[in-house]
Amino acid sequence: MKKREHLGLGFFEWQIILWLSIWLAISQQALGLRPIREKPRSWSDEWLFGRKQEAEVGPFSAWNITGTYRGTWKFLNSLNSSSKFQDFQKENGNSVVELVAVPTKITGVHYVQGVVVFHDVFDNEQNVGGAQINLEGVYIWPFRQLRLVANSGKESDSGQEDNNLLSNPYHLLGIFSSQVFQESPRDRLLKRKLSPVNEMEKHCNIEIAAQVSRVASSENNGDKNYYHMEGLMESPGVGDDGDCFSPLLLNATSVNVEVYYNKAVNYTLMVTFVSFLQVLLLIRQMEHGNTQSGAAKVSIVMIGQQAIMDAYLCLLHLTAGILVESLFNAFATAAFFKFVVFSIFEMRYLLAIWKATRPSNSGEGWETMRRELSFLYSRFYGILLGGILIMYQFHNYMQPILLLMYSFWIPQIVANVVRDSRKPLHPYYILGMTATRLAIPLYVFGCPHNFMRVEPNKVWCICLCTFMGLQAVILLLQHYFGSRCFVPRQMLPEKYNYHRRFNRDVSRTTDCVICMTAIDLRQHTSDCMVTPCEHFFHSGCLQRWMDIKMECPTCRRSLPPA
């Protein structure tokens, strides 16, 4: 008692000191759990918390913000006031953010890796267009706060990060379409190294502070939650260089990936249906020209060109199915039908045309025929592989290359004029193939909301339809009015006349070896036809015979077209 009085501390004083110690300990722990609320805020933090609504705090449930976000960006001050990166001159544009959030051992904190892609950033003179920046940071879900940074001077292989982050169908299909229709990975990497944003990542500390909110339930589709992020992107320079660019306002909403699943599945259903129609059209055409003479009238180049196109489509759909594993079944089905069209029907018809054009009385053995057949296959697959290399090297000119590939009716038009062929193709085959071949390119380059996210090009689509329609019209004119109906007579070669005059000094009659009935040669009428080898037949009999074989029924010599 004396000692306590000597210290000057009573029981009441000791109680106050004890409660103060407990309060300080609890407040320090609370301060550690609330680093964002209690630390000194920048003007961007004040803006961010000023826009936060009370209703957004709600119950403290962990939100999984992993996914793809698409939205817009714009400068707060309308223009970039910084002079360090003057190429950053656009006022606004589109942006895509890809985030992967992983829970940590710290309660309420998720570790986040991400990629932000800014479209329409630089002038067209840069030939870059957009900027891609790799980010990492934390998401503090009790306060719906997202903090991301991209440190300057950080050299890393972005390819491995892209493989880990950009793994959903939305981005994978975009990568696939950009590689096929727009640019190669080599050019994309070269542009990234030469891009001003590469220097930006080296000399700037990029910081993003965003507020995450849940999209209203009326805007949701299904049970999946969708989120909206709104925040600021600042880029203070390293040292005393000043800001790299003015603050950016980011707005992005999570993308409904199921929509892209459905679009991709609907596309594969369309390709499957189109392939089935092409099989029916090929069967109809093969029945139309099921004779040796009918098959010989068809251009082997025309069928081979279509077979190569279907082989390319088969490989493309199979590659897309392997790239996007969740859509493998849908794309593999489309690839299978294209494989059936290419390998079973078109290659079979190609061989029938090749056999019909070979002379049947050449007397060559099986070894010679097998050698010629091997040469045919070698040329076909050589052109197939060579075309892949050419398209890879000239991928920037994909649309002109497609126009060249869709000129497959031209070899048949030229063959009709040269051979004076008579109705080689069925009209249904001409119209059906023209329409079904246009389905895929019109979807890719004409549909504004295609799943590949290729920018529509209406002018090119109109040119393609006009080009294909003109070819089909010429083939139909040749079918109904003759193969050389549009060629001036002065340019036509001399044509053999089967109704030519013959020597009637000796009055005689002869038999038609086709129908075995007599032919009266004393009167020159259109009912009688004479071959270059001086054999006589009824007009109807010889025309039906030439539809099967272009050989004289009597002496087996080849006959000129009628």
UniProtKB/Swiss-Prot annotation:
InterPro entries: DUF2921, HRD1_E3_ubiq-ligases, Znf_RING, Znf_RING-CH, Znf_RING/FYVE/PHD
GO molecular function: ubiquitin-protein transferase activity; zinc ion binding
Pathway: Protein modification; protein ubiquitination
Cellular compartments per GO CC: endomembrane system; membrane
Principal subcellular localisation of the protein: membrane
Recorded catalytic activity of this chain's protein: S-ubiquitinyl-[E2 ubiquitin-conjugating enzyme]-L-cysteine + [acceptor protein]-L-lysine = [E2 ubiquitin-conjugating enzyme]-L-cysteine + N(6)-ubiquitinyl-[acceptor protein]-L-lysine
Key words of the record: Membrane, Metal-binding, Signal, Transferase, Transmembrane, Transmembrane helix, Ubl conjugation pathway, Zinc, Zinc-finger
Classification via CDD domains: RING-H2_TUL1-like
Gene3D superfamilies named among the record's database cross-references: Zinc/RING finger domain, C3HC4 (zinc finger)
Span of the signal peptide: 1-32
Lumenal-side segments: 33-262, 319-321, 395-397, 448-458
Bilayer topology: Multi-pass membrane protein
Ranges facing Cytoplasmic side: 284-297, 343-373, 419-426, 480-562
Function recorded in the entry: E3 ubiquitin-protein ligase that regulates the degree of methylesterification of pectin in seed mucilage. May be involved in the recycling of pectin methylesterase enzymes in the endomembrane system of seed coat epidermal cells. Possesses E3 ubiquitin-protein ligase activity in vitro when associated with the E1 enzyme UBA1 and the E2 enzyme UBC8. May be involved in xylem development.
Protein's name according to its UniProt entry: Transmembrane E3 ubiquitin-protein ligase FLY1
Disruption phenotype: Seed coat mutant displaying primary wall detachment, reduced mucilage extrusion, and increased mucilage adherence. Decreased degree of homogalacturonan methylesterification in seed mucilage.
Entry's free-text remark on domains: The RING-type zinc finger domain is required for E3 ligase activity.
Tissue and organ distribution: Highly expressed in stems. Expressed in root xylem and seed coat.
Organism for this UniProt entry: Arabidopsis thaliana (Mouse-ear cress)
Pfam families: DUF2921 (PF11145), zf-RING_2 (PF13639)
Gene Ontology biological process terms from the UniProt entry: mucilage extrusion from seed coat; mucilage pectin metabolic process; plant-type cell wall modification; protein ubiquitination
Transmembrane parts of this sequence: 263-283, 298-318, 322-342, 374-394, 398-418, 427-447, 459-479
PROSITE patterns registered for this protein in UniProt: ZF_RING_2
Compartment annotation: Endomembrane system
RING-type zinc-finger residues: 512-556
Enzyme Commission number(s): 2.3.2.27
